[in-house]
Amino acid sequence: MVDRVKTGIPGMDDILYGGIPRRNVVLLSGGPGTGKSIFSYQYLWNGLREGEPGVFVALEEHPVQVRINMAQFGWDVREYERQGLFAVVDAFTSGIGEAAKKERYVVTDPEDVGLLIDVLKEAIRDVGAKRVAVDSVSTLYLAKPVLARRTVMLLKRVLSGLGTTSILVSQVSVTERGFGGPGVEHAADGIIRLDLDEVDGELVRSLIIWKMRGTKHSMRRHPFEITDKGIIVYPDKVVRIGRRVSIE
């Protein structure tokens, strides 16, 4: 029997045959505006509601903005932070600014992966985290793509070793076929790709699970929506991308 972590995202656990296998490190890959951050927020929030503490690593946005973004969907994490069940790791500000001085977990040099991992370990242990999201892991190797696989492997050892089930957000360009860095797809346990394609003059969101160690999963591309309550995946519908895109 596979021990699974439910994402809690409507429709997502159906195409994962029940959820992400525990301790898996999943690469959440996609272009700009595809919903990667929202997916990771929703995953952490649903964990909190199920009694699973979490950690969010902010590499691309100010921690204050992260909390605002989450609250817009009704996911106010501040009470969980006060209870010691949720933490934001500030790997964005380098500790600069008045708001940053109020953050408990600050990475003073976000380009120092070793330092980031030390602060992340502290946060995971302090809150007893079961779920972690890093947004985005690509930021750690933008200047040196050759380090992509090594960076993901380092994070995987720590995250899996500490018993967490984790999402690493990975940025790709709109036209890029890969997953956001050379070799990262081999280092991750799972890959979920989010896309945005034009259909008859409208943008359609879809996702596909490229791989997921330890479980069967849907091999089809499914449409999803972003609502005011978060992401909804439609497991019974399929998006076909060829010379033209169609939904069935």
Curated annotation (Swiss-Prot):
User: Which residues make up the binding site for ATP?
Assistant: G30, G31, P32, G33, T34, G35, K36, S37
Supply the InterPro entries for this chain.
KaiC-like_dom, KaiC_dom, P-loop_NTPase, UPF0273_KaiC-like
Can you give the residue ranges of the KaiC domain?
A: 3-247
The alphabetized UniProt keywords are: ATP-binding, Nucleotide-binding
* The UniProt record lists the keyword ATP-binding: yes
Question: Molecular function (GO) terms listed?
Answer: ATP binding
Q: Which family does it belong to?
A: Belongs to the UPF0273 family.
Q: What is this protein called?
A: UPF0273 protein APE_1505.1
Organism of provenance: Aeropyrum pernix (strain ATCC 700893 / DSM 11879 / JCM 9820 / NBRC 100138 / K1)
